[in-house]
Amino acid sequence: MAKKVQAYVKLQVAAGMANPSPPVGPALGQQGVNIMEFCKAFNAKTDSIEKGLPIPVVITVYADRSFTFVTKTPPAAVLLKKAAGIKSGSGKPNKDKVGKISRAQLQQIAQTKAADMTGADIEAMTRSIEGTARSMGLVVED
């Protein structure tokens, strides 16, 4: 028989840097989950990813206080900022441009995000990432 699901907890945790401090501790503590067990498992799973990159994670908490979790790919905005070498996007994206990004970089980001995106093909996903880049104040170059 399947376990009864108690809650789903969605967080963004830095890769390889999960610890019991906020936001992880309070979110999991409310559900009665062993926080250190999650931190160790998450850090082990995100070993191969660049440290400090925010990783969205969905934690399924069961009635017996056990848990499973699924990691996603980093947010597109974070990958775009890293590729363009900027700290933050533009406050006025249509007026102030903060950086440039090539179409090849957009395709590479779309490939990275492909597992989590619901696009028809890689071209559609690239266009979606391109829209995110433009709304951040990045200029897309061919």
Swiss-Prot record:
Any one GO MF annotation of this record: large ribosomal subunit rRNA binding
One GO term (biological process): translation
Top-level lineage group: Bacteria
Gene Ontology CC: cytosolic large ribosomal subunit
Sites bearing N6,N6,N6-trimethyllysine, chain numbering: K4, K40
Ligase as UniProt keyword: no
Keyword Glycosyltransferase recorded: no
Post-translational modification: One or more lysine residues are methylated.
SUPFAM superfamilies per the UniProt record, alphabetical: Ribosomal L11/L12e N-terminal domain (SSF54747), Ribosomal protein L11, C-terminal domain (SSF46906)
Keywords carried by this UniProt record: Methylation, Ribonucleoprotein, Ribosomal protein, RNA-binding, rRNA-binding
Disulfide topology: none
InterPro entries, sorted: Ribosomal_uL11, Ribosomal_uL11_bac-typ, Ribosomal_uL11_C, Ribosomal_uL11_C_sf, Ribosomal_uL11_CS, Ribosomal_uL11_N, Ribosomal_uL11_N_sf
Residues where N,N,N-trimethylalanine is found: A2
Stated family: Belongs to the universal ribosomal protein uL11 family.
Subunit details: Part of the ribosomal stalk of the 50S ribosomal subunit. Interacts with L10 and the large rRNA to form the base of the stalk. L10 forms an elongated spine to which L12 dimers bind in a sequential fashion forming a multimeric L10(L12)X complex.
PANTHER family recorded: 60S RIBOSOMAL PROTEIN L12, LARGE RIBOSOMAL SUBUNIT PROTEIN UL11M
Function in brief: Forms part of the ribosomal stalk which helps the ribosome interact with GTP-bound translation factors.
Protein name listed in UniProt: Large ribosomal subunit protein uL11
Originating species: Shigella flexneri
Organism taxonomic ancestry: Bacteria, Pseudomonadati, Pseudomonadota, Gammaproteobacteria, Enterobacterales
Primary gene name: rplK
